């Protein structure tokens, strides 16, 4: 098999941000500065890093980043009050509650408190339902990034058999719905699926979203398949055993530098679009 096409997320991300810079400038002409509010509950180091990365990405593009840090003892009631305040703040266009939250908080209730027009990461129940029906303004950012990569490289989706390994509500489930809405035939595998390899071996498109390092083995990949690795594990390792998968795939995302950069760009894109809709 020839060398696979490397699906460079940094390149896709740059193209998205170049276009967004023009949109931000146009909004500034109207006296509007896009604003993303991020809520971090507790002091989890990984979550703090993710919030900082998102804030830095906002600033580089001229988007205001409003960071709200709450103590880990915060109650559901207190968090809901903070979200309601942001909902009522017309200068805030997007609200992101960093996942996961401490165990005493009802995360679903917190997500669903976010106003649908500010749900730039597609986490509300209503946003999830709109995504399933194919008319969400703001689908979950990582699934949106996966579709953006496929489209950027003009890789066909319609009529292809896509196997999604993972069923999380912020990745596996929504990306399955988005692929289905693009006329792929979709199979979802999960922790209770027996013989996952039997399904992956038949896939034209493999989406790895299982959260286990090197879970997808190279010998599982059908020759010529497209592999999108949405996993990011300790040591900069994805969910796919990269070298083995790359030997059989026609196209593959690296980790890091694949899906991750595009995910952040989709968050920025949704925030700018929310600001445009507010004018």
UniProtKB/Swiss-Prot annotation:
Binding site for NADP(+): 166-168, 191
Molecular function as annotated in GO: methenyltetrahydrofolate cyclohydrolase activity; methylenetetrahydrofolate dehydrogenase (NADP+) activity
Name of the protein this chain belongs to: Bifunctional protein FolD
GO cellular component: cytosol
Keyword Amino-acid biosynthesis tagged: yes
One Pfam family from the record: THF_DHG_CYH
General function of this protein: Catalyzes the oxidation of 5,10-methylenetetrahydrofolate to 5,10-methenyltetrahydrofolate and then the hydrolysis of 5,10-methenyltetrahydrofolate to 10-formyltetrahydrofolate.
Organism: Shouchella clausii (strain KSM-K16) (Alkalihalobacillus clausii)
Subunit details: Homodimer.
Keywords: Amino-acid biosynthesis, Histidine biosynthesis, Hydrolase, Methionine biosynthesis, Multifunctional enzyme, NADP, One-carbon metabolism, Oxidoreductase, Purine biosynthesis
Catalytic activity: (6R)-5,10-methylene-5,6,7,8-tetrahydrofolate + NADP(+) = (6R)-5,10-methenyltetrahydrofolate + NADPH; (6R)-5,10-methenyltetrahydrofolate + H2O = (6R)-10-formyltetrahydrofolate + H(+)
PANTHER family: C-1-TETRAHYDROFOLATE SYNTHASE, CYTOPLASMIC, C-1-TETRAHYDROFOLATE SYNTHASE, CYTOPLASMIC-RELATED
Family statement: Belongs to the tetrahydrofolate dehydrogenase/cyclohydrolase family.
Database matches in HAMAP family: THF_DHG_CYH
One biological process term in Gene Ontology: purine nucleotide biosynthetic process
EC number(s) reported in the record: 1.5.1.5, 3.5.4.9
Pathway: One-carbon metabolism; tetrahydrofolate interconversion
